[in-house]
């Protein structure tokens, strides 16, 4: 399956990409969310931003395009459940929630690479991240499989 790798620049997102390749998937693009210009790190429930400035080097090494977006939202919906349980219904979360930044980024990647069917995710122990990534992936205009080989 052709996939996009969500990449923070950290070891977990990179290691998960290795697992994707070992499982026969083809990385066709990378995507990253970074702090607004002038900030190196932000306090985010959803995103690791410490290594965001090195992500371009990984994309160059893999010879795949890199899609970047700024993290504009904040963690408005901090509950265990995100949005509607039925992914065919419109998300009831605020457009200002940081999770929606991921949705907009993946939508942009999917428009450029309509053959992408999955997303590599380096989440290990965070149900908070897993629930939100899965919610975004199963929206009708994306329909992507979440590939989190490192999960627990």
PLM region spans:
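ATP-dependent adenylation/nucleotidyltransferase module used to activate substrates
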Residues: 1-152
């Amino acid at each position: 399956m052709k996939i996009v790798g969500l990449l923070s620049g950290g070891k977990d997102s990179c290691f998960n990409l290795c697992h994707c390749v070992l499982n026969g998937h083809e990385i066709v693009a990378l995507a990253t969310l970074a702090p607004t210009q002038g900030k190196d790190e932000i306090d985010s429930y959803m995103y690791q931003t410490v290594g965001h400035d090195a992500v371009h080097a990984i994309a160059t090494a893999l010879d795949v395009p890199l899609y970047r977006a700024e993290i504009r939202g904040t963690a408005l919906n901090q509950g265990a459940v995100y949005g509607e349980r039925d992914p065919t219904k419109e998300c009831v979360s605020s457009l200002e929630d940081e999770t929606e930044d991921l949705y907009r980024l993946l939508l942009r990647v999917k428009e450029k690479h309509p053959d992408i069917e999955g997303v590599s995710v380096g989440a290990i122990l965070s149900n908070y991240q897993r629930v939100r990534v899965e919610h975004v992936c199963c929206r009708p205009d994306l329909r992507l499989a979440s590939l989190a080989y490192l999960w627990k």
